[in-house]
From Swiss-Prot:
Residues 71-604 are virion surface. GO terms for biological process: symbiont entry into host cell; virion attachment to host cell. It is a single-pass type II membrane protein. The lineage of its organism: Viruses, Riboviria, Orthornavirae, Negarnaviricota, Haploviricotina. Residues 1-49 are intravirion. Attaches the virus to sialic acid-containing cell receptors and thereby initiating infection. Binding of glycoprotein G to the receptor induces a conformational change that allows the F protein to trigger virion/cell membranes fusion. It holds the Pfam family HN. This is Glycoprotein G. It is found in: Virion membrane; Host cell membrane. Glycans are attached at N72, N159, N306, N378, N417, N481, N529.
């Protein structure tokens, strides 16, 4: 009870004190004024309200800013879409312009370039030929009728009462005065002689050979048949191996007599592909006023060196040797090949300058790509009996560009039957196993009534591979055993090597059979042991060189050589194309030489 009384008393006393003091309150922390407390509470309410307003305004501002950001983002997205559409439109316009340049402007520029470098100079040369022929004919007739020789032509010194002269010799292309080598051979010198009876003549004024410094002209093609020819090359700016492809020319024309009874060449029709760097390894075959040129198309470089990544693509270009005006696709026709019968081979392509026709069927030299795992070869057939260090597997291992390559290469022919109509169908025919070496550039041509096959020596068999064709389909060749013509080489396959080794090197240097009874051939070989140099035109048998003449100074580098021979007024002539480095600017360019095969073994 005492405790409770005290507690009550204490409360009462406190109330009294508060009533007495009125405005003062005492707590643990000290004495405070109630008015001040109330004023503080009011200030706190105002501050809280102000903070609330500020917070609301801040939230509103943040919301507004977010809305603005979203709107700006939306506008940006819309702008990006508009920009994207604009860019797509610009890209489409650029593509359309590029296509127009490629399809319309490019060919016109090419036509102008062709006219300035080929047609106009050729026509000037042809006009000069006609004038030369006319003058020569007038001289002959005046000399004959007036019974004296005219140094310069002075008609007024001749008796005007002389009979009218005979009609002068008209210009005529060789296609009207030439024939292929058929039947019995014509008379030629068959004795070994050191006399300079061969006199090469340079052909340089009617083919589009660019002589500007720094321009490399490589990958040439030459085919001559029935007085007509096909020609091709690739122009590069800078290095021959790594230069930028500028232009590829594929042209056809006639072989001409300029009045001096020496064959010349006049180009009549030229085609330039819009993408020159994609055209590789072309081969041409003539048939009834047209040359058919078959090419490999590749966007990954040379199909031989990029065989695994190359997706087989072929094209055929048909060019009229006597083009007509306003004749649609008669003059020039480009055809993409869609059907190829390749048998066990994964891919095939043309590989060599020229082929032949038999009836309505064209045959192009070719090569097939066969997976190494599917290549069947009996090592016991490898000719190592006289080779001390060669291994039996070398023949099999050397069938690819290296011993571990995915594909082996095998030579053969691509067959195209013109009479079938409809879609073009090509069929690959592989070469028989006798004397089998890696597939390389080859050539099949008709001479003296029978096809002849040449295959470049790109492997251990370095002697020239040339022989009569027993059958075209299947392709069987009677190889000659030549012991005097071999290509230069290094490493394990040097010149005159006949022992199987694993190597891949060599040059294309074909030869043309001009006498089957004595098996005499003519062509350009490289007279060097290790380096591709010293081009020499030679007439040779299997076991001896009868006579020869150098086509350049000693140590002049050269590579590919192509030779075609024919009759001009019953005299055998050959035209040889030679890839040669003698221009002084370290780039290669082809030269063409006309060489008459002498009937007599003494100089005339």
């Amino acid at each position: 009870m005492m405790a409770d009384s005290k507690l009550v008393s204490l409360n009462n006393n406190l109330s009294g004190k508060i009533k007495d003091q009125g405005k003062v309150i005492k707590n643990y922390y000290g004495t405070m004024d109630i008015k001040k407390i109330n004023d503080g509470l009011l200030d706190s309410k105002i501050l809280g309200a102000f903070n609330t307003v500020i917070a609301l305004l801040g939230s509103i501002i943040i919301i507004v800013m977010n809305i603005m950001i979203i709107q700006n983002y939306t506008r940006t997205t819309d702008n990006q879409a508009l920009i994207k559409e604009s860019l797509q439109s610009v890209q489409q316009q650029i593509k359309a312009l590029t296509d127009k340049i490629g399809t319309e402007i490019g060919p016109k520029v090419s036509l102008i370039d062709t006219s300035s470098t080929i047609t106009i100079p050729a026509n000037i040369g042809l006009l000069g030929s006609k004038i030369s022929q006319s003058t020569s004919s007038i001289n002959e007739n005046v000399n004959d009728k007036c019974k004296f020789t005219l140094p310069p032509l002075k008609i007024h010194e001749c008796n005007i009462s002389c009979p009218n002269p005979l009609p002068f010799r008209e210009y005529r292309p060789i296609s009207q005065g030439v024939s292929d080598l058929v039947g019995l051979p014509n008379q030629i010198c068959l004795q070994k002689t050191t006399s300079t009876i061969l006199k090469p003549r340079l052909i340089s004024y009617t083919l589009p050979i660019n002589t500007r410094e720094g321009v490399c002209i490589t990958d040439p093609l030459l085919a001559v048949d029935n007085g007509f020819f096909a020609y091709s090359h690739l122009e590069k700016i800078g290095s021959c191996t790594r230069g930028i492809a500028k232009q590829r020319i594929i042209g056809v024309g006639e072989v001409l007599d300029r009045g001096d009874k020496v064959p010349s060449m006049f180009m009549t029709n030229v085609w330039t592909p819009p993408n020159p760097s994609t055209i590789h390894h072309c081969s041409s075959t003539y048939h009834e006023d047209f040359y058919y040129t078959l090419c490999a198309v590749s966007h990954v470089g040379d199909p031989i060196l990029n065989s695994t990544s190359w997706t087989e693509s072929l094209s055929l270009i048909r060019l009229a040797v006597r083009p007509k005006s306003d004749s649609g696709d008669y003059n020039q026709k480009y055809i993409a090949i869609t059907k190829v019968e390749r048998g066990k081979y994964d891919k095939v392509m043309p590989y060599g300058p020229s082929g032949i026709k038999q009836g309505d069927t064209l045959y192009f030299p070719a090569v097939g790509f066969l997976p190494r795992t599917e290549f069947q070869y009996n090592d016991s057939n490898c000719p190592i009996i006289h080779c001390k260090y060669s291994k039996a597997e070398n023949c099999r291992l050397s069938m690819g560009v290296n011993s571990k390559s995915h594909y082996i290469l095998r030579s053969g022919l691509l067959k195209y039957n013109l009479s079938l109509g409809g879609d073009i169908i090509l069929q690959f025919i592989e070469i028989a196993d006798n004397r089998l070496t890696i597939g390389s550039p080859s050539k099949i041509y008709n001479s003296l009534g029978q096809p002849v096959f040449y295959q470049a020596s790109y492997s251990w068999d370095t002697m020239i591979k040339l022989g009569d064709v027993d059958t075209v389909d299947p392709l069987r060749v009677q190889w000659r055993n030549n012991s005097v013509i071999s290509r230069p080489g290094q490493s394990q396959c040097p010149r005159f090597n006949v022992c199987p080794e694993v190597c891949w090197e060599g040059t294309y240097n074909d030869a043309f059979l001009i006498d089957r009874l004595n098996w005499v051939s003519a062509g350009v070989y490289l007279n060097s042991n290790q380096t591709a140099e010293n081009p020499v035109f030679a007439v040779f048998k299997d076991n001896e060189i009868l006579y020869q003449v150098p086509l350049a100074e000693d140590d002049t580098n050269a590579q590919k050589t192509i030779t075609d021979c024919f009759l001009l007024e019953n005299v055998i002539w050959c035209i040889s194309l030679v890839e040669i480095y003698d221009t002084g600017d370290s780039v290669i360019r082809p030269k063409l030489f006309a060489v008459k095969i002498p009937a007599q073994c003494s100089e005339s």
